[in-house]
Structure formats: C-alpha cells, structure tokens
Design a protein with these regions (language model features):
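Solvent-exposed alpha-helix faces
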Residues: 70, 199, 258-262
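Ligand-binding pocket segment of bilobal, Venus flytrap-like solute-binding proteins
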Residues: 71, 180, 184-220, 239, ...
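Secondary-structure end/capping motifs
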Residues: 248-361
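Internal, well-ordered alpha-helical segments in soluble enzyme and binding-protein domains
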Residues: 161-164, 186, 190, 204, ...
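Short, glycine-/small- and polar/acidic-enriched structural segments
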Residues: 2-10, 14-177, 200-213, 217-230
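Extended ligand-binding regions for polar small-molecule ligands
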Residues: 41-44, 111-129, 233-287
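Conserved C-terminal helix/tail region of periplasmic/extracytoplasmic solute-binding proteins
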Residues: 329-429
C-alpha cells in the first residue's frame, strides 16, 4: 500500500527529472505570466522547473542574460533589439519569441508639478493631447521664469517607457532632449525619488504609479494605453544560441507561458493572482494596489475615485502574446528617431528578425489555438475591435490607435522616419 513517504519520494523524483531553467524578472505586475507558470503548475506540466530570480534593474537583467547567468528573462521590448544591434553595450544576438502582454505603464508627476499642470488647465479626465498642452505651458512658464527644467525618469534608455514619454512630449511640442531632463532609474527607486523631489515625474510600469499615488507623492497623468492602445511592452528574451541548443525547452516554456497568460487574463482569477504577486519573493506590494492594474481601475490621485482605463494591461486577449515584427520595427524606428541608432535597411532587417513569430507558432502548432496568419501589421490602423486572418478564423484585434492618429506601416519605415524630420542618407545600406 502506497504511503505518504512513497508519495513524497515520487514527487521529489519528478522534480529532479524536470528541465531546470533560470529566468530573471523585475518586480512588476506584467511579470505575472512567469510567476503563474511556476506557481500554478503550467511549467511543471511542460516538464520544466522554473527558478525565478528577482532583479532590481533592467541593466542587470540584460547583462545576466548576456553572460549566461539567466537562460531567459522578462525583458523590455526594445532591449533584445539593442543588444542584437550592439547599441549601448556589447553586441549579443538575442531573440524575443513571446510577448508578456500589452500596455501596463503610466506617466506620473509629483503632486506639486501636477498642481502646476492643473493651474495650466489639466483635468483628470483629459486625454493625452490636452494633458500634454497643459504640461507644455508648465515647461514654458518654468523656462521663462528661470526655473530648472523638469527632471523625468524612465527605466532604461532602450525601453518602451523612454519612447512613449518622448513621443508624448514631442506631440506637445516639448523637445525631450532640450526642454526637459530625462534620467534613468530602476522601477523600484521611482517612488522614493519622486517623494524626495529628486525627480519631477516618471514613466514606469505598475505597481509603482499606484504606489506613488498611495504614498501621496504622485498623480497619474497619462497611461500607455491612452498613448498607444494595445501597445507592446515586455518580452521574453533569450540569447539567440539558446534556441539552437535547447529548442524543445524553449518551445515548452512558450507553451507554459501561453497557458499562464491565458489564466492571468481571466477576471475571475485576478483576486488570486493579486495575492500570488504580492508575495515577498515577487512584488512584495499590497494585493489591493496590484489589483488596480489587473482590473484597470486606477486611482489617479490621493483620495480619488477609481477610474476604469480600457485595455490598461492586457495579458492574453487580442493576440497579446504574439511577437509581432511590426512591434520590433517600431521600437527600432524610435531608436533611429532619437539618435540611438543609425538607419539602414540592413539594420532594420536585423531588428525585425529579433522578434520570432516562427518560434511562437512552432511551439503552439499542435495545441489547436488560434494564431495570426501575418507576422506584422500596420500599427494604429484598427479603430475598433476587428476580425483578422488567423488559423482558426476567430481572432479579434484592436483597437490599437496612437493618440495622435499616426499609422506605422512596417513596410514604409523610411517614410515614417522622414515624417518626423529624420534625415536618411541616400543609398543607406
């Protein structure tokens, strides 16, 4: 007759037989699919044992993937592109075969700066264009009065945060390189820096915006989803040679994360997900605060009422986990726009190939799930939820608009860059 000891021995033997993967993450709500894959057994069901290692900065994440400390990592969407192109660090080919979701960031200002914006006409219900106009008046007033320029923090130079902040400022006719000061801080340092007046605002993922509000230090002015509805954010990053050495492990991890993201995206699971993420090993933050991001019911300022933000953070719906190559090329376009990278068709192609929909499709081919037919799309073209071509004919994408109405056609990259005044040399290769 089996005993409890026999059951324990069998479980231990099973754990020893699992392929072990070490994966780094930053404590943000959008790391949820990784945590769920481990805690809810989706990884074990794919014969994987996940060791999740919490890091404090994105630079550490990148470096530890580069040198092989991590097999993979929760990574900023532009980061594997920059590493592959050798921009800002040693050239290390990387791939991104999975997206952790869409949205999840916000731009928060100190209470005192937001008061200046209110005096310039800002109101909580305003869209990003009008909010930007109020900020432009504050920037102009400070300049005319001889006051220091605003200091705004982002999490890394090669981040969606940096690019969406710059995009918003530029639409408001604020020069991000001349009229404000943009600095880099780890996400976990943002709230203290804002409270201590070392910075005037930041763009970061949750729960840090809501924690700033809860501390009375900040006011959420703009969300990523209002700047680019269903815009890309974090990816699963690997060194390119991992896929060559361990293709089955990579595919197994993609399947586990797909199922975990599907679970995390269900509203009925959000209370449990909030409790899981709140644990000291993960976000070490109150479950109630985490729940704001999960539900999209954000409190913008201290004492304010919750406000539902559509598509604030999307874990699974709308092909949120698919690594669209148009996302990769948009990130590259911003590197070029802001002087981080030169433009050439060869570099654009290299950037495009960092995102790997072929590996995503291959991992999920036998599951029967619906998959997009295309690997890239015109970003910003869908004004409403729209059926698109897919394997099972049941996929809905969008809306995915940019707040200024622009479109990004990945096949017209040069024209897109020129529309921002970027000079491209004739015959760039």
């Amino acid at each position: 007759m089996p005993t409890i000891s026999d059951d324990i021995d069998e479980t231990t033997a099973r754990e020893r037989s699992l392929a072990r993967l070490t994966v780094g993450f930053i404590p943000l709500v959008d790391c949820a699919p990784l945590v769920v894959a481990k805690e809810k057994g989706f990884a074990a069901a794919e014969d994987l044992s996940l060791e999740l290692v919490r890091e404090t900065s994105w630079a550490n994440i990148r470096d530890r993937v580069m040198v092989g400390h991590f097999d993979a990592a929760h990574m900023l969407g532009p980061m594997p592109i920059a590493s592959t192109l050798g921009i800002g660090h040693a050239e290390t080919p990387m791939i991104a075969p999975f997206s952790f979701g869409l949205g999840g960031n916000a731009i928060t200002f100190s209470a005192s700066v937001y008061a200046e914006m209110e005096a310039a006409g800002a109101r909580p219900a305003m869209g990003p264009a009008e909010m930007g106009q109020a900020l432009a008046k504050v920037v102009s007033s400070r300049r005319d009065g001889g006051d220091p320029a605003l200091t705004l923090a982002v999490v890394h130079p090669f981040s969606g945060h940096n690019y969406e902040l710059r995009y918003w400022l530029a639409v408001a006719q604020i020069d991000p390189d001349q009229e404000v000061r943009i600095v880099v801080l780890p996400p976990s340092s943002m709230v203290a820096a804002l409270r201590d007046r070392q910075i005037d605002g930041f763009c970061v993922g949750e729960p840090w915006n809501s924690l700033a509000v809860e501390a009375g230090a900040g006011v959420i002015a703009v969300t990523k989803s209002s700047l680019w509805r269903q815009g890309p954010e974090k990816v699963l990053g690997f060194r390119a040679d991992f896929a060559q050495r361990w293709p089955e492990r990579l595919s197994a991890l993609l399947r586990a994360l797909y199922k975990a993201a599907e679970w995390a995206g269900r509203k009925e699971n959000h209370p449990e997900l909030g409790r899981i993420l709140a644990a000291p090993d993960y976000l070490a933050a109150p479950a109630e605060i985490i729940g704001r991001a999960l539900s999209g019911n954000l409190v913008r300022g201290s004492g304010g009422a919750p406000e539902l933000v559509p598509d604030f953070l999307v874990f699974h719906d709308h092909a949120a986990n698919f690594p669209w190559q148009s996302h990769s090329l948009w990130f590259y376009s911003q590197m070029v726009r802001w002087g981080q990278a030169p433009y050439s068709p060869a570099l654009a192609e290299k950037a495009r190939q960092v995102y790997r929909p072929d590996l995503y499709r291959g991992a999920l081919a036998r599951t029967g799930i619906d998959l997009p037919r295309a690997s890239a799309k015109v970003e910003g073209a869908l004004k409403v939820a729209t059926p698109v071509a897919s394997r099972n004919g049941a996929m809905i994408l969008g809306p995915d608009g940019f707040f200024d109405g622009r479109l990004f056609d990945p096949d017209q990259l040069e024209a897109y860059l020129k529309s921002f005044g970027v000079q491209i040399a004739d015959g760039a290769k």
